[in-house]
């Protein structure tokens, strides 16, 4: 299959297995959820009644005071007591094998092509880190909410885009399923398309 190049005549020949496959919503959902789960810190920690300091001595006699019986001042029903079902640090990561992950990326790319949200350009670079220049370039292409993908890290592009709302830059190695679906359009260079195709082959 062929992808049209926005700023050049002709097109770019790409693999149908990468850019023309059927959209697998269940797979994409599973991979995105797993990716988001892996980003969780999972460091929350509370203390149970046995972990809170103090509370070793019985506060008052079992009988004869007229008060409710109590064995420790660190009971979960007491102020400053332990927590009944205390949260503990845990690993939220989910296993996603390589084939599934690549399948999800291909599925997303194919859907972007179908919806005409993947815009291929011959090259996209700035001579200096100028946000104004980048805004002008994006305006020319009628893009606002966009992920810019280049074949390698472009320092000028990164510095120019970091203060712009709904604009992000990535190199091919930095692409993930969440970033691909988070933006309205994906602007990608022809060299990055070929590099991405090789990585997903």
Swiss-Prot record:
Keywords: Ribonucleoprotein, Ribosomal protein, RNA-binding, rRNA-binding. It holds the Pfam family Ribosomal_L4. It comes from the Bacteria. One of its GO terms (biological process) is translation. InterPro entries: Ribosomal_uL4 (IPR002136), Ribosomal_uL4-like (IPR013005), Ribosomal_uL4_dom_sf (IPR023574). Belongs to the universal ribosomal protein uL4 family. Part of the 50S ribosomal subunit. PANTHER family: 50S RIBOSOMAL PROTEIN L4, LARGE RIBOSOMAL SUBUNIT PROTEIN UL4M. This is Large ribosomal subunit protein uL4. The gene is rplD.
